[in-house]
A protein has these predicted regions:
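Carbohydrate transferase catalytic cores enriched for Leloir-type hexosyltransferases
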Residues: 1-390
């Protein structure tokens, strides 16, 4: 299909988009580039500031606008206009000028928009774990999710679990739900730092496990700390490197309380926090790890689980419904409240680990990755095309 015949689909990448959201869009756009003859053409609207989230992604048109640069005159004019006219009319005009036929992963910008929209609800965590949210946050999420369901032509969810949640949350809009299982696209191994370089940069030695979750309360880091304490008491040394954002907006005290707990458990030498690190370093740590860990109490569709599947890495993961749905072939499940079970999984994984066989599995997994990326992209493409035809 010729480029001028393709349906143009717009994405809005605001500067304050959360890290998980940016990674989600990156994985989707990289997968889309694998389609041999696409019928849609992605346009990403973002700020004029440098944005590494879009670096190296082919087949994507990027439209940079000062309307997305915070505290600039165009941004301020956009905000004032949106408030006065009850709609983001300045950005809507830009989308119309670029011929956008479908707006993806957000609600319509203006009332009765001429551009159909496909909303996105990452998860219904606040329904399942209300204690992790304040009353105001729960009300806002209820309101925002219901607005998406009502105003959007379709609503993307990442799992069958989330589709059932939407059906229970807004049964009158259940028919709008579209399940899109995303696939992680790891960096090319040739550009990743080698293990000796990573060891020197981050100051660790020996085999290690990687916990690449944000430091948010529901991510359940405490169970990992407890498992390390149990192992240390038995004179078994297991090193866990933890990466991710250390600020939890809803629980600002969480990280400090976690580190106090790690101190009390005497495992600061085994639970090493690296924080937010460059993407290629994170990918390199995944490649060389004994295994990944995801102990989370709740997920919409876990990025780290998908990364383990795309890389061909073992992962120790909490036994929750969405992790069962993701079904990693090399997954080792444990109850999210069972430190003993996690400790056992860590020991067994360390004992089983062999560098040569691990890299052979990774190599064979990469051979099959493209077909999964294509399936991911084709599913999204059909959602967009069917929305545009309505």
């Amino acid at each position: 299909m010729q480029p001028d015949e393709r349906t143009r689909v717009g994405f809005l990448l605001e500067p304050d988009t959360w890290v998980g959201g940016r990674n989600y869009f990156r994985n989707l756009l990289i997968a889309f580039a694998q389609l041999p003859d696409p019928e849609i053409e992605p346009f990403v609207f973002t700020s004029k500031e440098d944005d590494t989230a879009l670096a190296g992604i082919p087949a994507v048109k990027v439209v940079r606008t000062s309307m997305m640069d915070r505290r600039t005159l165009p941004w301020l004019a956009r905000k004032i206009t949106a408030k006065a006219l009850a709609g983001d009319w300045m950005l809507q005009r830009l989308l119309n000028q670029k011929g956008i036929a479908v707006l993806s992963h957000r609600g319509p910008l203006v009332p009765n928009s001429s551009i159909p929209s496909v909303g996105w609800i990452p998860d219904f965590q606040h329904v399942h774990l209300p204690a992790f949210f304040g009353e105001r946050d729960r009300r806002e999420r209820d309101r925002d999710f219901m607005d998406l369901c009502r105003k959007c032509d379709k609503v993307i969810v990442s799992s069958e679990c989330a589709r059932l949640d939407l059906q229970a949350f807004a049964p009158q809009y259940a028919g709008k739900a579209e399940v899109l299982h995303f696939v992680a696209s790891p960096a090319e191994q040739g550009i990743l730092p080698l293990l000796p370089e990573l060891r020197q940069r981050y100051g660790f030695e020996g085999p290690y496990f990687l916990l690449p979750n944000q430091f948010w309360a529901h991510k359940n880091h405490r169970i990992v700390v407890k498992a390390l304490q149990l192992l240390k008491q038995r004179h078994q040394r297991v090193l866990v490197l933890a990466t991710g954002e250390t600020k939890d907006r809803r629980h600002p005290e969480f990280f400090d309380s976690l580190m106090r707990y790690a101190t009390e458990c005497d495992v600061l030498d085994l639970f090493r926090v690296l924080g937010v690190i460059p993407f290629n370093d994170l990918s390199g740590l995944m490649v060389h790890a004994v295994a990944l860990i995801n102990p989370s109490k709740f997920e919409g569709w876990s990025t780290s689980v998908e990364e383990s599947k795309s890389l061909g890495k073992r992962i120790l993961l909490s036994d929750i419904p969405v992790h069962r749905e993701q079904a990693p072939a090399l997954g080792v499940y444990f109850s999210p409240d069972d430190a003993e079970g996690l400790a056992r999984g860590l020991c067994e994984s360390l004992k089983d680990f062999d560098t040569e066989s691990d890299f052979r599995i990774q190599e064979s997994t990469r051979v099959n990755l493209r077909s999964k990326q294509v399936q991911f992209a084709e599913t999204f493409q059909q959602i967009v095309l069917s929305t545009g035809r309505q």
